[in-house]
Amino acid sequence: MADRYILAVESSCDETSVAVLKNEKELLSNIIASQVESHKRFGGVVPEVASRHHVEVVTLCIKDALSEAGIVAEQLDAVAVTYGPGLVGALLVGMAAAKAFAWAHGLPLIPVNHMAGHLMAAREVQELEYPLLALLVSGGHTELVYVSEPGNYKIVGETRDDAVGEAYDKVGRVMGLTYPAGREIDELAHKGKDVYDFPRAMIKEDHLEFSFSGLKSAFINLHHNAEQKGEVLVTEDLCASFQAAVLDILLAKTKKALERYPVKTLVVAGGVAANQGLRERLAEEITDVDVVIPPLRLCGDNAGMIALAAAIECDKKHFADLDLNAKPSLAFAGFEE
């Protein structure tokens, strides 16, 4: 049987990435052009700046991905692209590049949900056993997803307000930490103590929804009041207390979901899955199912994960026409025509 090659393009936010996947899960290349330095001074992603950077580098990323993979365009079998969710301008740049490439080389186009990419990044670790449950945690999303079979996704719980990664960045900004703040807060938390009493919203309620806005507000109020009174707060303890509250919420809801949906595998993915505190708590507290977390290099936004998700859609022959539109608010409902 001939080898199958898929070129994948990801541009949903502030990373321009192109990857080449051989067969089901062998990543031959995964080029990532990060824009973090460009957005740091703004304390967050500026959509117009992100789109401009994507335009500047996406063609070069495609060339580099093919070169590193050691193949030429004529060997490709399909082109995959993130079509949502994400920033509409950023999505459109990657989609335009992918559609043009697919048209020029007569290749089918595979539309991929960005969050399916995060989830399916776990395929590089091991073959996944279905049905499974996934905790997806990133800058824009916090959701529990039940996957009955490859490509069939159902949200069973999600945040009512802030995503967990968004909360990290907002409290990081209050403390004067560099954007994105997640890694630094995690590192500082390991040096501090959980001494500040922050709320754990809805932690004892029976549903599977999350809320982080109250925790974020409590943190901001504590920090503001201390500044007004001239009090000095220990940054390491602030981070430890904030992270303890976040992880208590995530673990409590995940455990409830596992009780409700008896599965053998829990996938934890998304940018926040790189958090060492989260990984430690998962290892300590969830021992009756197989916990699968993508390697650090596949936790943040990257085209490798899009390619891994695309392989499943390709198997099902889920292709799109070249008039495919970006869906910035795309929700998990499996494949959308």
From Swiss-Prot:
Localization, per the record, is: Cytoplasm
Q: How is the cofactor bound?
A: Binds 1 Fe(2+) ion per subunit.
Q: Which GO terms describe its biological process?
A: tRNA threonylcarbamoyladenosine modification
Q: In its keyword annotation, does this UniProt entry include Translocase? A: no
Q: List GO terms (cellular component aspect).
A: cytoplasm
> Could you say which cofactors this protein requires?
Fe(2+)
CDD domains from the UniProt entry: ASKHA_NBD_TsaD_bac
Instruction: Please list the residues that bind substrate.
Output: 136-140, 169, 182, 186, 275
Reaction catalyzed: L-threonylcarbamoyladenylate + adenosine(37) in tRNA = N(6)-L-threonylcarbamoyladenosine(37) in tRNA + AMP + H(+)
PANTHER family for the chain: TRNA N6-ADENOSINE THREONYLCARBAMOYLTRANSFERASE (PTHR11735), TRNA N6-ADENOSINE THREONYLCARBAMOYLTRANSFERASE, MITOCHONDRIAL (PTHR11735:SF6)
What is the documented function of this protein?
Required for the formation of a threonylcarbamoyl group on adenosine at position 37 (t(6)A37) in tRNAs that read codons beginning with adenine. Is involved in the transfer of the threonylcarbamoyl moiety of threonylcarbamoyl-AMP (TC-AMP) to the N6 group of A37, together with TsaE and TsaB. TsaD likely plays a direct catalytic role in this reaction.
Q: What is the official name of this protein in its record? A: tRNA N6-adenosine threonylcarbamoyltransferase
Instruction: Record the organism.
Output: Streptococcus thermophilus (strain ATCC BAA-250 / LMG 18311)
What gene name does this entry carry?
Answer: tsaD
